């Protein structure tokens, strides 16, 4: 897998537009998708096997539990120093870093995205994207079906209501 110190990652982290078809990014996404698929094939009752896969998929995050149908783009850009609890159908598009504070709970069908696409169709077709980090503070609850957009900073203690969209 590529390392965040590589040039393409530095381009992403600096907020520049980048090509999503870059070979290093394709390789990293393919690995993450394979690990997500393996994780999602295991029953939730297979705690030890699931934790081993989660540790491989999310090497920079402590995760207490994930429900079924977890998905992420890379996994290596998800950060949590204390365990995060995730429900079913959680999607984290982690082109840029997505960081979680302590005691965060993510309910079912939450989407967290750090990437955006250009408005011009030709640039979208060519695979251009831009990413902005997402920061989620301590003791936050992301309720069912909410969406967190690129660049959002959620302060400590916030409760994002079901179905809400966080834009900043």
Please place each PLM-identified region on the residue numbering.
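A glycine-rich, hydrophobic loop/mini-helix early in the fold
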Residues: 57-77
């Amino acid at each position: 897998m590529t390392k965040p110190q590589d040039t393409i990652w530095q381009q992403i982290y600096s907020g520049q537009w980048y090509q999503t078809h870059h070979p290093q990014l394709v390789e990293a996404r393919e690995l993450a998708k394979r690990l997500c698929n393996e994780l999602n094939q295991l029953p939730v009752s297979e705690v030890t096997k699931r934790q081993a896969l989660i540790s491989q998929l999310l090497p920079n995050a402590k995760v207490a539990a994930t429900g079924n149908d977890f998905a992420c783009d890379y996994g290596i850009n998800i950060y949590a120093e204390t365990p995060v609890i995730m429900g079913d159908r959680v999607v984290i598009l982690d082109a840029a870093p997505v960081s979680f504070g302590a005691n965060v709970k993510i309910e079912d069908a939450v989407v967290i995205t750090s990437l955006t696409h250009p408005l011009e169709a030709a640039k979208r077709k060519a695979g251009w994207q831009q990413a902005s980090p997402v920061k989620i503070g301590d003791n936050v609850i992301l309720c069912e079906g909410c969406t967190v957009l690129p660049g959002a900073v959620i302060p400590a203690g916030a409760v994002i209501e079901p179905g809400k969209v966080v834009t900043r």
